[in-house]
Amino acid sequence: LPEHTEESLLKQLMQELEEAAAAVSVQIMGGHTEITRVVNQPLVTVCGVGKVKKNGLISTGGAKPGMDIIATKWIGLEGTAIIAHEKEEELCTHFSRHFVEQAQALDRYLSVMPEAATAVKSGVGAMHDVTEGGIFGALWEMSEASGVGLEIDLKKIPIRQETIEICEFFNLNPYQLISSGSMLIGTDHGSQLVDALAKEGIHAAVIGKAVEGNDRVIFNDGEKRFLEPPKADELYRACLLYT
């Protein structure tokens, strides 16, 4: 915590951590808190430990050629919510306050546990949460881990209008923006899984396929480009350019 932090904020953080852990039946085993001048806002790091049955592990590297690639919810959720909170007043000079509040509220979608549970029941080959580096980074990581190529339709990648407009305002690439809340899934039955997720109230879309070889190709209205290795997340650029 930064210097001059009020004790009430620490109590609030502890309560939020307890509530979040209880919601997913996780125990908090310990922790450490300190005041330091090297941060200018609260910083929380978490190390999670879990276990899974050997035959129940679904990894990033399980995609096979021919599998459909699904993206759940929408990309850029976390990055959009963070920017909307941190740059609220600046955004309100260009957008309505209602729009900014809608963007801030996207953080309610950050858990991927609901879609993971549905995917496991449906039977899938690979799962990978989309975090730093955005959807482009996650696609590269899944392809690299699985030893497959990709053919992805950019237009099919689900994205919210709030993310599009905020990224345009700050000249950011939404496809390289931290996207916690979205998950990549490799499955032989893409349409059926999308339908199963929809029944649970979870938006999802088939965005492409895993293919033989190493080429990771993005198609956009007939144009073809090759996916590049993950770059620094656009959120960091936003923080550097607009503080």
Tell where the protein language model's regions lie, with residue ranges.
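Helix-biased detector of long, well-ordered alpha-helical tracts
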Residues: 1-241
